[in-house]
Amino acid sequence: MYLKAVEINGFKSFGDKVYIDFNRGITSIVGPNGSGKSNILDAVLWVLGEQSYKNIRAKESQDVIFSGGKEKKPATKAEVSLIIDNADRYLDLDNDTVKITRRIHISGENEYLINDTKSRLKEIGTLFLDTGIGKTAYSVIGQGKVERIINSSPKEIKSIIEEAAGIKKLQANRIEAQKNLANIEINLDKVEFILNETRENKNKIEKQAELAQKYIDLRDEKSSLAKGIYITELEQKEKNLSENENIKEKYQTECFELQEKLNKTLERLNTIDLEKEEVKKEKLLIDSRNKELRNIISEKEKEKAVTSERLDNVKKEKLVKEEYILHLDNKIEKKLEEVTESKNKKDEISKNIVEMAAANKEFENKIFNLENIKVEKFDLIENRAKKVRDLELEKQLASNEIENNEKKLKSSQDEVENFKQELEEANKKLLANNKEKDLVHSQLEARKEELTKTEERNEFLVNQLSEISKSINKLSQDIREFEYQEKTSSGKLEALVRMDENNEGFFKGVKEVLNSGISGIDGVLISLINFDEKYEKAVEAAIPGNLQDIIVEDKEVAKKCIAFLTEKKLGRTSFLALDTIKPNRREFKANINGVLGLTADLITADKKYQKVIDFIFGGLLIVENIDIATDILNKNLFSGNIVTLTGELVSSRGRITGGENQKSTINQIFERKKEIKTLEEKVTDLKSKITEGSKKREDLSIKLENYENEVDKIDSLEDSIRKDIDLLKKDFESLSEKSEKLSKDIRSISFNIEDAEKYKTSYQDRINSSFSTIEETEKHIASLKKDIEADENLLKQTISEIDSLNKQFSDTRILFLNNQSTIEQLEKDIHSKEIENVELQEEKEKNSKIVIELSHNIEELETLEEELQSQIEEHTKIYNSENRDIETLNEREQNLSNEERELSKDKSKLETDSLHANDRFEKIVEVIEKIKVDILNINEKLNELVEITAQVIEVEKLKSSKDRLRSLENKINNFGDVNLLAINEFKELKERYDYLARERDDVVKSRKQVMDLIQEIDERIHEDFHTTYQNINENFNKMCDETIRNTEGRLNIINPEDFENCGIEIFVKFKNKKKQPLSLLSGGEKSMVAIAFIMAIFMYKPSPFTFLDEIEAALDEKNTKNLLGKLRDFTDKSQFILITHNKETMKESDSIFGVTMNKEIGISKIVSPDKITKILSENKENN
């Protein structure tokens, strides 16, 4: 099959009839811009059934009709025909040549013809189904459609794949099957309704027929069954009474036992409370004693420490005294030896002196007095000299002390200076370190603040990314949902529009007339008028038979239509001929609340139908309710019919019609019109939402990418800041440690300075004290030396006198005196030493007594120390013992608490158990009382049934018997009058019911067959689609590799689990680039990808002929040649007709013709290639 020719007449710029022949292979259509080349493509789309004038670059239907030009009248119609070679029977028509025609008149009426025979648009669409040819197929690629393919939604791309898969016819069959299924469902509902109604009638009559016979049987059965039940129940009740009495005693015993246990538990709990209180008191008492013991132990330990210290001091003092006594013993022994020696020497000298005594007595007396004076002076001088020596020694000691202290003072001063230098140096270091630490700390805080801001920003960005992603996902989901809704609504709208176009829902006669093609038919009344929805019921109730009247131009057209119906035996219908209608308008002048007006005034339509509206609706008044209608009728205020908003009709003669019907045909047509309007608004709104959502999604995607880039930068910045913070933290810790060390050093140095200053002050005080001592000593020495000097003068005088006497008394005297003096001296010495010895003895005795006393003191202190230690140990032992007692008490208290807790649980459980036991006891008492009452009632009932023979009822069947008894009672109570004639009536109804049931089963079987067919079609659709998808996917990858060099192409099914709503996305991956969606490609890349996609489809299923409008416009020369080479490969399977400006395309074409336009009259013409070349050259020069 191929396209032999296109015939265009009055379509757009083709004001004159043109006939364009096409050959096989590649044909190029060329011409200047604006010459009308693309109108040829629009004509092809239009004849194939394009309903959207926007897609063929027109605003409304009249735009496709030639509008005229200079000295050229406008055309009254536009007509396009496709002449197709069908020798291979590619199309399902038994003709070698097929002619497809579409014609539109200036009135807007469309005509479709196949081989010059009138047809319907649906038949043309069905003819081309699954051929790749059609208004939306891939065989007609208009201007910009290449890029539109790339920018198509996944569902639109899926539709292209479906066309290539050849499943459009299957989808159409499925739609048809679904319609059949819907009709079957309607028929099934009707049959079910009649069947249910028949079943109800049958059941009613059946009950009446059986009623009389059943009544007595049921009554007797009821009495016998009742007595048997009563006897069995009585036996059961008496048995239950005995059993429950036993249970009652058991429950009563259980209550007593539980109460006794509860009482014991409560008693024990009270005892535990008392014991715990005693334990607390005992613990408080022990705590009080322990506190006193701790105080006593503390005091004893302090006292012991003092005693030990005193003991050590006494021992040291005793040791010193004992050493001193030994020293005194040695000294006494020496003194005794000296006394003995002096006494011996005295005795020896005394013998000599006796001899000289007489001679010397006189001299002695003289000299005695002088010697006494001398001795006194000598002793005085000696004592004073000794004092001077002692003072000199003291002075020397003081001087030595000064020298030592001055050295120590100098050393302390040097030490203080050194310490001060160290302190100054340390302070400087600390200050510098603190400055550095503060700097590091400020840097650290700054970086931390920077990190916090960065983290906050990062967190904000992450939250934003999450929110944006959610928003994008939500938008994508919403868009998919909107697209699904839009497709569903559009599909539903198209179906409703097709139903409207096909006049579905009208009476058969009306429908056949409308589809007959008879000229002069305007349409059905209901389709040509408009009114507010609230008047629907009123209009339908008032003129139900007129709404499907057909409006025709004149009575001749009406006659033709009636003849058509008569000839075809298609039924009857009414016609409203515009030339015979006589308006019948009644006026209503009264002003009454609730009157909405004449129906003719409430309806809108074309002015040409005003006569029809006045004729049909001029005598009909619409009011709010029936009260207003009857009031107007009674007052004779209106001579026509009156209808209410709820559909009650009051005729002019007083007949009132009302009620509610099921949905009528008219109502369904009303509903369809409303639904079409609603769906149109919904589709427009959904498309707007899809566009708006896509724009928002794109904006959010850009924002998301910006935020992601910023997050990457922030992550790097965060890592850098954290590293800086870690380094600064280490520096700060190091500096802090250094500051702490320096502070410790400073404190240590300060303490050292303080100690050195104290020593310095102490040494200075000692020096000052020593200077004072030296000064006082020197004064004392000076005073003593003056006294010694005076005494020595006196002593010299005395000695001089003695010397004078001694000279006089010679040597004897001297010897006598010397001996005497020696004896005296010896006696003094002996006396002195004896006194010293006595003093030493006394000192020894004194120190011995002290030693004895100290020994006693030591013994007492040691005893005291031992006593104190004993007391401490004793008190500690008591303290520890009482602590153990406290632990024992704590353990006892814990045990009591644990016991109390367990007993509390037991108490709660016992209380609950006791309460439940009491409840059970009370309930069993109630049960026993109820059983007794039941026994009494049963005995009374049995007394009433004495004469009745009782059925034997087993206990296990008692419940079912009672159910049976209740059923019998209900049946008997429901008995009414018995209709004996109902049996025959029931037989007739049963036969009718069986017939309808068989018919219902046949319809159900048909429904199953249709459903199985739909399932089979679905499976076939799925299988063919996926096979096609896989082949085209492979082909697309191959074509991308061949046409776009080293480029990978892939198709991807979105939402594959939902076949009806799934879509297909196109992805490409250029060499050295990431896989990316087509929206990110350049214009040239998009064109090449689209061409690769189209070629991939051709590889799988080439279209018999293909129109391509400037498909290579965005391609360079190389890619254009590549494209033409691919097209050449398909010329054995497909015919290509290209609209082009490209020279390479023209060169590769098998045939070529041109299109030019006469600008004055605006008519396009077909010209030869040579002429079009000349025109193109002229246009190029002019430009």
Curated annotation (Swiss-Prot):
Top-level division of the source organism's lineage: Bacteria
Main location group: cytoplasm
One annotated Gene Ontology cellular component of this protein: chromosome
InterPro entries to which the protein is assigned, alphabetical: MukB/SMC (IPR050308), P-loop_NTPase (IPR027417), RecF/RecN/SMC_N (IPR003395), SMC (IPR024704), SMC_hinge (IPR010935), SMC_hinge_sf (IPR036277), SMC_prok (IPR011890)
Record-linked Pfam families: SMC_hinge, SMC_N
Keywords (A to Z) from UniProt: ATP-binding, Coiled coil, Cytoplasm, DNA-binding, Nucleotide-binding
GO molecular function: ATP binding; ATP hydrolysis activity; DNA binding
Coiled-coil boundaries: 162-483, 666-1019
Residues that bind ATP: 32-39
GO biological process, one term: chromosome condensation
Compartment list: Cytoplasm
SUPFAM superfamilies assigned: P-loop containing nucleoside triphosphate hydrolases, Smc hinge domain
Domain spans labelled SMC hinge: 519-632
Purpose of the protein: Required for chromosome condensation and partitioning.
PANTHER family for the chain: CHROMOSOME PARTITION PROTEIN MUKB, DUF4476 DOMAIN-CONTAINING PROTEIN
Family: Belongs to the SMC family.
Domain notes: Contains large globular domains required for ATP hydrolysis at each terminus and a third globular domain forming a flexible SMC hinge near the middle of the molecule. These domains are separated by coiled-coil structures.
Subunit and interaction comment: Homodimer.
Protein name: Chromosome partition protein Smc
Organism name: Fusobacterium nucleatum subsp. nucleatum (strain ATCC 25586 / DSM 15643 / BCRC 10681 / CIP 101130 / JCM 8532 / KCTC 2640 / LMG 13131 / VPI 4355)
Native organism taxonomy: Bacteria, Fusobacteriati, Fusobacteriota, Fusobacteriia, Fusobacteriales
